[in-house]
Each structure stands twice: as structure tokens, then as C-alpha cells.
Amino acid sequence: MSLLHNLLVNIAEQGGILEGVLGDDTGHLFEPTPWKTYDQELPPRGAWEASQKIVADCEALIALLTPTKIKLVTECIANNSTVALGVAADFKVADKIIENGGEVSLGHLAEVCDTDEHKLGSVMRLLCHRHIFAEVAPDVFRNNRHSYELRSETGATGMMLIETEEGYQAGLGWVPTMKDPVTKHDIDPGKGAFAKAFGVDVGVGPWLSTPEGSKRMEKWVAGIPWLSSITVVATRTDLPWDSYGPTLCDVGCGPGSVALDVKKNYPHLNIVCQDLEPMIPVIKETFKGYEDEIAAGRIKIEAHDYFTPQTTIADVYWLRGVVRDYEDDVSAEILRQLIPALKKNPRARVLVNELIVPSLITPPSTANAPASQHLPTEQSAYPSTCHVMSLSTMVLMGGKERTFSDIVKIGEKAGLRFRRFHQFRMFTGTVEFELAPETGRRGSHL
């Protein structure tokens, strides 16, 4: 059978499965409210798996039915959808629609935005075709489910502006850094695309502390927590946190928000949050209100450098977004520092949580099979989102996003053994390791 036939059949089959699992909870697109199951919670695993297959096959179907030159033109000018989203965020269009009673004419919207009606109309119609906002009559707009999230109170506009401003500009430095013989292999953010485009020798983090960068700090303060919140539900739901043992150690925990969320969901767990000394006041602020548990030792906040041997004995060690910041040898060294503690508790697990860069391998022998059948399970979900997210983080922050096999090799180099992969219902995933038997038998070299 042809690729067209197979895609259409599989989309129909997976659609039937999806409807069967969801029942009456079929969601909505044009109402200005979240679809609770998909936007605030997680769909049942069966519905989620069917959704992933449908999206993958629909993307392939669109590519199949799009003329080649149209496909390439669309991709090369897709940056203009970023421009449009930046306009909606900067002018607070979602807020203005709400303030106008939920519906607004283009003329009035341009007036309250103090901008040109024709230019704003071009932006709004582009976004409507991408199902962000809805044009309900000629030149009349409402929020829909997706644009409703762009209310100022959510922090989403902050994230949009990070990408449409710093991210957009930093992207111009990506090709030069890939060609530069000095920087093409370097993952140091001070030598990356952001530094190249902005003419500085530091990454975006230190730059935000400079006089120029501090002017743009407000959107980062709002946007980054919003972005982090996307993965919260999957992080606490898609791992069997209570199956490892009573103590979780978050290594390089940042503000400690992940550990706090796990604690809320599994109150019987003991939590250890570790980061460098300057982060300790921030972590303590995160756990404000938990003073009794801290006093009882059920929550511990420790200053720890993950380049030094781990001395805290726990049942599971969680490293989120740590490995990506370093070259392979350095990442392996960080994991190797856990071995002294793992030898004291050989049943303990190490969880490496990252964007797991997806692949779509299509052998000629199965080229007509639905695209969803070519998606490995040991990679991040939402592959299109994961790919642009991984490139975005490397452009802005340097580092090295990796595939599943890359991370397994790093763990094995550190003296760990791969145990299993946890595919989150999100664009991150977690690789679970344990102490390799041969490592446990050897003396520590740390």
C-alpha cells in the first residue's frame, strides 16, 4: 500500500483508540479556557500514545501533500510566526481582548495597542491560521484555548519574548559559531551563538547581570518559571517516586522546585536538596512553610558541589538538566562522583532527566509505513517541540543536548549500568541507572 493510504488508515485507527479512551472528554480549541486533561493534567497513557501517533502521522501527511518548493519556502520563512507571536506578547493582545469583553474588532484592537491596523491584522491572521486566537467574523477576534494562556498573569508572554527577542537575535550567531574553527566544537556558552550575536564573551546567564542585560531581566523572571511549569506534572507523575526507597536527593537542584513538587505528591518521602552555597537562600525560600519538616530532618538543604564525591546516602539521585551543560567526559565525571554513595547503598538509582533528542529513522524498506511506526520509545515525546527546544537551549545557553544512547554511554563511562528509560508524557525523559556490578566490586578511584 502507498504511504498516503497507510497514513490515512493509521490516523483513523489511532483516532478511534483516542476517542475510546477519552470518551466524552473530547476537548475544545475555540473556547478561551484550558482543556484540563491536556493543558493542566496529563491524558491517560493510552490517549497520550494515540495522540503522539496521530500528530506524527499528520505531520508526515502534511509533508506528503505539500509541494516541495512550498514546503521549503514555508520552513525558511517560519521565523515570521515567531515575529507574530512576539507582537501578540509585547502588545498583550490576549489581555486586551479580555478587557474588551472577550471579543474585539481589529480597528479597536489597533487603537488600544496604538499601532497600525493593517500590520496588526497581518499578525493576527497569521496566528489564527496557527490556531492561536480565532477570527470569528471578518476583522473580529477572540481568544481561543491557546491564546488564552498568553494572559500576563501566567508568565507565558515572558517566555515568548525571551525567544522572540534574545533567542531570535542569538540564532543569527549559530551558523558563524558552527563555521568558526575556534568555536565549532565548543559548548561553552561564552563562545556560543548568543555570545557571538551579542558581541560578548559570556553566556546569557551572566549577561543578564550586566547593565544591558538587566534591562531585559523582567521577562526572564516571568518566563522561565512558566517554561519550567510545563514539565512539572509529568515529572511528578511519570516516575514511580515511592518505589525507590524513602530518600530522594536532588543533585544540582537549582531553586528546589522539583523536589518540593515531588514532596507534595509523596509527603512520606525524605528530600535532600543540594546545590552550591549561593543557591542555599533561594532553596530555603522555596521550602518556606516546611520548617517543621526541616527541623525533623525530613527535608535537608545542603551545600554541595557535584564535582566532589557524594557523601549523602539516598535511595534515588535526581539530576535534572545537569548533564547537558558539560562535555561527555565532564558529565561522566559528575556521575562518577555518586559512586562512593552508591557503594554504600547499591540498590540506589540515578535518574538523569534531560531533553532526549528524538530521531525519525525511515529505512527504505519501510518507507511507506506510517511515520508513527518509526518513532523509538526511548526518546522524548513531542519530537518536533523537543527538537526546536534543544536547538533553542544550545543557541541561548550553550551546552550539549543528547540522544538516549549518548546519555547511556556517559553513564556507562561513569561506572553505572542502564536500567530503564522513563518516557514522560512531555518533551523530556529520564534515563535510570544503577551501580554497575563491576564498579561495585572495584575500589573507589575518587
Q: Language model features by range: what are they?
A:
Residues 209-212, 216, 223-228, 250-254, ...:
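Short, contiguous, pocket-lining structural segments
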Residues 1-121, 135-137, 241-446:
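Alpha-helical subdomain
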Residues 11, 159-162, 174-175, 215-232, ...:
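Short, Φ-rich (hydrophobic/aromatic) sequence segments
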Residues 90-91, 171, 217, 229-234, ...:
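Short, well-ordered alpha-helical scaffold segments within catalytic/effector domains
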Residues 223-247, 261:
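Conserved alpha-helix/loop element of class I SAM-dependent methyltransferases that forms part
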Residues 3-58, 118-223:
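N-terminal auxiliary segments of SAM/dcSAM-dependent transferases
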